[in-house]
Amino acid sequence: MTTLTHRARRTEVGKNSEKKVESEENVNQDRNQDNEDIGDSKDIRLTLMEEVLLLGLKDKEGYTSFWNDCISSGLRGGILIELAMRGRIYLEPPTMRKKRLLDRKVLLKSDSPTGDVLLDETLKHIKATEPTETVQTWIELLTGETWNPFKLQYQLRNVRERIAKNLVEKGILTTEKQNFLLFDMTTHPVTNTTEKQRLVKKLQDSVLERWVNDPQRMDKRTLALLVLAHSSDVLENVFSSLTDDKYDMAMNRAKDLVELDPEVEGTKHSATEMIWAVLAAFNKS
């Protein structure tokens, strides 16, 4: 009896230790996330989704292009990459039958809250879903592009508006009402142009002055943002202020980057697997 009691206690202690280690890992992931963001901006920390939307917004008008039908799915891809970078989800390890990025399922690593409503809502969906789904399927489900009525519950609604409200709270956007003949629309003009210009310059520098010609040597968040900006069709907005020569160079380098084989690049570093899986999903769609 004594032996069983001690063994049970050791098991309980072991489980508590595992939970403590996992909790500490999540805290470290979030702390690393904060440190990376602080390196970019000492005052304001943005998620990948917020950065993509900010790049897509017209500064004065406060809305994205009516012709852009890519940004919705791009924002959902940003959510998956953000969760992976924060240590909440990961791709299942490759096997003989499942080597390709788009064949491997998205698995839950930790369900501890991130503090971001959209991220935590997605995390709950991923946790509750059986069987597990692939990156491409999750982007479709979160966007609402599914023929299965039982899976419409996974659609994230009003994503752009919710992200815009976050940016309003962070002092980057403001909220206005504009009349468009037949209807009124809520818009979010940019008020903190310094923050947007910092973001634009960061991406411009990544393919010009700081170009390394090797995605494995790039900052992970910068790589992710370039992939998402391309997939969301807002990359041209980033380079539009450049001179003709620099514009051509930047676009060509960005094109070379996103035309790399995700399957090859994804095997080089596990930390960037989700980035390349998201790119592979957009390449296929």
From Swiss-Prot:
Keywords for this protein: Golgi apparatus, Lipid-binding, Membrane, Phosphoprotein
Principal subcellular localization: Golgi
Presence of keyword Lipoprotein: no
Biased composition (Basic and acidic residues): 10-23
Membrane topology field: Peripheral membrane protein
Subcellular localization(s) per the UniProt record: Golgi apparatus, Golgi stack membrane; Golgi apparatus, trans-Golgi network membrane
Presence of keyword Membrane: yes
A single Gene Ontology CC term: Golgi cisterna membrane
Domain of life assignment: Eukaryota
Modified residues (Phosphoserine): 112
Assembly and interaction partners: Homooligomer. Does not interact MYO18; differs from GOLPH3 by its inability to interact with MYO18. May interact with ARF1.
Name assigned to this protein: Golgi phosphoprotein 3-like
Source organism per UniProt: Bos taurus (Bovine)
